[in-house]
Structure formats: structure tokens, C-alpha cells
Amino acid sequence: MCDEEFSETSTESEVSYEGATEVRAYRLRVESEVPLPLPAFKGGTGRTTVRITEGKVQFPSGADGNAAAENGSLYLRISNAGTFRIDGTSVTVNRSDSARDWNLSAALLGRVLPALLYSQGHLVIHGSAAAIGEAGVAIIGFKTSGKSSLAAGLYDAGHRTVADDAIVVNFDGGPSLVPSFPRLKLAEPTLGALDLSENAGDSSKEWWFPVDDGFEPTPVSLDSVFVLEESVDAASPSVAPVTPRTAMEALLRHAGSVDVVRATQTEERHFRECARVAEAADVKRLYRPDDLSQLPELARTVENALE
């Protein structure tokens, strides 16, 4: 099963899309010099206005990893996209020579804006999320585990998409899922398995698949977390409970960006926030066979686990 998360390698051919320079993402009003493949902002107010501009960014010399904090700014460098500086609600983009629009928009939406929100006190987890009835469900797992594919399966089953690629958790009250934007990053095998190819747009290895008709625009309580794993011997999907220790380890392991946590020296805060999620949400392990034709059954397994 293919997982449609942000990859640091460029796609084989440029993805064509009509980008907008004023959009809403993560409940933020985003004004961007880099066109983003989202619906244009149509009025109303976002929680905060974020401005993305192109300019010169010098990653701090001597810094380890792909994130650094210096003089109140947060720096990111992302292969095949560029170097980014976050100053409060301002983002400066220094695109690399090899950056294609697909890679740059994927980096901004999947890595940079979540890092900005992390710097403002939100928890960021790598994964996808959906609303099933009134329940908010997070799907976490390693790269290629099939998180986006399952999110697409849940969308196809009539459930609302909350986030893909990066899960942002707010702690005003109990943990809640912050809606990201009405797009899923899907590859052709998943689209074909769910008969969604006609709605995907121009062909390439991956698409920003529109889910405007099935997007949840308001925060949803984070009630369940599924740790998705492939089981080569499994004939059908299954769910298993996990210990509190295993739940905590899974949440820590799938942090949105370990480099950002380390660069900002917020390990203790990150640990406390993961502990709050582990305590508040029902965490289970979800096993899936390596068979895209079972996506509908995988979605039903999630539904049944919530009953």
C-alpha cells in the first residue's frame, strides 16, 4: 500500500494545478507569494493571518539537523524545496534551484505551517485525521504505512476529512484536532482502488485530491488514535489494544518534526502534550494487509472499533 505523505524527493513530472495566493489552512488566513493548491480565500476572517514571502534565507551555520532556532527565528531546510525562516506569523521562503511547485507547496503545507503552529504551542503529529460522526480520529504510523490511503478510504465511506500529512492538536480544553485544508495527497494506486481517478486532475505520481465536499472545517475532539501498521500475514484488517506505555511511545515516535522539537529545546513540553493525548484518547494498533482492494474493509474496521 502506498502512503501519500510529503516526500523529500521530487516527482517525476511537474504537477499542474491552479494555485491561490490567499487561502485558508489550519484555520489560518494565509497570504502567500507562492501559489498554494487550495481554494481561494472567499472572505471571513482566519484565526491569524500568516504571510509567506520569497526572499533570501541563510540557515544558521554550524546547526545540526534540518531545523535551527536563532535570535527568535525558526529555520527549516527541506530537500528539493528550499530554506525557510519563521518569524512569528511571517514565513520567508528561499526556494532551491531544483524546487518544483509540487515540492514547495507540499513543504509549506505539510512542514512549514505545522512548524509555525508548533512554535505557537500546538502539538504536531505526522499522520492523517478524520471525523467519524462526532468522534475525531487520528491515524499515525511510519512512512508508507498507508495513512493517507486510509484517510481516502474513510472519505469514500462518507466520513469527513480533518487533516492529511500533518495533524495539529490544540489544547484549549481537551485535545482537539485542528482542520488543515480540503486536500488529500494521493497516488494513482489509491485513486484507482477507490474509483476516484476522474476527480484527481492532471496525472503524475501524486495529486492534491480535492475533498471540499467532505471536509470538516471546525475543530473536532481527539477521541481515538490508530497506529497503522502493515501485517504481511494478515488476510484482513484487525485492531488490537496497546498498553499506556506503547501508546505514549507511538505518539512520541511520530512527532511532526523531531528536528523542530530539538531545535526549540521543547522536549519536555512535547512529552507532556503527547502524555495528554495518550491519557485522553483511546489508542489502538490497526493492522492492515498489503492490499489496496481492502481499503473499504479497513475503513469499516475503524468504524467498528469506535462502536
Descriptions of predicted regions:
Residues 1-100, 300-307:
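Long, basic/Gly/Ser/Thr-rich N-terminal segments
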Residues 150-151:
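Post-Walker A alpha-helix
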Residues 7, 61-63, 68-70, 89, ...:
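Residue-level signal for well-ordered alpha-helical segments
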Residues 146-147:
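Conserved glycine(s) of the Walker
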Residues 154:
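Aromatic pocket-lining residues of Rossmann-like dinucleotide-binding sites
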Residues 2-33, 39, 128, 132-142, ...:
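Glycine-rich, often acidic-flanked micro-motifs
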Residues 77-135:
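Extreme N-terminal, non-catalytic leader segments
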